[in-house]
Curated annotation (Swiss-Prot):
Keywords: Acetylation, Cytoplasm, Initiation factor, Protein biosynthesis
Expression sites by tissue: Expressed in inflorescences, leaves, stems, siliques, roots and seedlings. Accumulates at highly levels in pollen grains, developing embryos and root tips.
Function summary: Component of the eukaryotic translation initiation factor 3 (eIF-3) complex, which is involved in protein synthesis of a specialized repertoire of mRNAs and, together with other initiation factors, stimulates binding of mRNA and methionyl-tRNAi to the 40S ribosome. The eIF-3 complex specifically targets and initiates translation of a subset of mRNAs involved in cell proliferation (Potential). Involved in cell growth and differentiation, especially during embryogenesis and male gametophyte germination. Regulates sensitivity to sugars (e.g. sucrose).
Family from the record: Belongs to the eIF-3 subunit F family.
Record-listed N-acetylalanine modification sites: A2
Pfam family, one: MitMem_reg
Protein name stated in the entry: Eukaryotic translation initiation factor 3 subunit F
Length: 293
């Protein structure tokens, strides 16, 4: 008599495996507005809240990349074993956003913190009922590793036969889409601490130092070409010629006068802004004292 045995198989079931190929998530493309919104909501959170959550809005590109362009916070209460989300507020905010831009739909949700926790699975289940295969974005506002780490996850279900046991979060690549001006601000904000933001004069000094460095690099390149050390590049030569031709033909004395006039304007603006800050600080103290009386 042949012996028979039955085996129970544990398997991962990804939500994307049941969806079409166009909805499989490859990369989360995040625009800087989303990160700044998350940080702003975290700063304004109630004192009792350890983290904030919110809805991510955007679209799914043909290659499966999730383009995250906007977000809004959603009030919630969280304990060790349960999570309460203000669903009415979420739906009202979504309706308001759709009136402004109907092309932006729900693509996932975000939370602040170093990673996922027990409550993340419950919140992710809610958003999975709102949209197939949602993205979970985490922003480390506590600077655990010395900077604000940004991660994105998708969820896979660990099932025992037909029974779903637990959700497994799998990290996916994150692409921060920023222009140079946005990246400068982001690099300053993501640091643990900032000693001092440069004022206008310090910014001008840094710009001039960088300009001098670039001019020296051009001099070295031209000297190397003339000396036969490197082969000439016609494209670089035309670019340098166009840059030199775009400079106004001014006598040195006139140029010095223009720079000095601009410097005087900067000093005047700094003086006026200092007076304004002093006046605002004094008015705030007087207003506080009047309310206490």
């Amino acid at each position: 008599m042949a012996a028979t045995s039955e085996h129970t198989i544990l398997q991962f079931v990804s939500p994307s495996s049941t969806a079409s190929a166009t909805t499989s998530v490859l990369t989360a493309r995040i625009h800087p507005l989303v990160i700044f919104n998350v940080c702003d909501c975290f700063v304004r959170r109630p004192d009792s809240a350890e983290r904030v959550i919110g809805t991510l809005l955007g679209s799914i590109l043909p290659d499966g990349t999730v383009d995250i362009r906007n977000s809004y916070a959603v009030p919630h209460n969280e304990s060790s074993d349960q999570v309460a989300v203000d669903i009415d507020y979420h739906h009202n905010m979504l309706a308001s956003h759709l009136k402004v831009n109907s092309k932006e739909t729900i693509v996932g949700w975000y939370s602040t913190g170093a990673g996922v926790n027990g409550g993340s699975s419950l919140i992710h289940d809610f958003y999975a009922r709102e949209v197939p295969n949602p993205i979970h974005l985490t922003v480390d506002t506590g600077f655990t590793n010395g900077e604000g780490t940004i991660k994105a996850f998708v969820s896979s279900n660990l099932s025992l036969g037909d029974r779903q046991l637990v959700a497994h979060f799998q990290e996916i690549p994150v692409d921060l889409r920023m222009v140079d001006a946005e990246r400068v601000g982001f690099d300053v904000l993501k640091a643990t601490s900032v000693d001092k933001l440069p004022n206008d004069l310090e910014g001008m000094e840094l710009t001039m130092e960088r300009l001098l460095t670039l001019i020296n690099d051009v001099y070295k390149y031209v000297d190397s070409v003339v000396g036969g050390q490197i082969a000439p590049d016609n494209n670089i030569g035309r670019f340098i010629a166009d840059a030199v031709a775009s400079l106004p033909k001014l006598p040195p004395q006139v140029f010095d006068n223009l720079v000095n006039d601009s410097l005087q304007d900067q000093l005047l603006l700094l003086y006026l802004s200092s007076i304004t800050r002093t006046q605002l600080s004094l008015a705030e103290k007087l207003n506080t004292a009047a309310q206490m009386l």
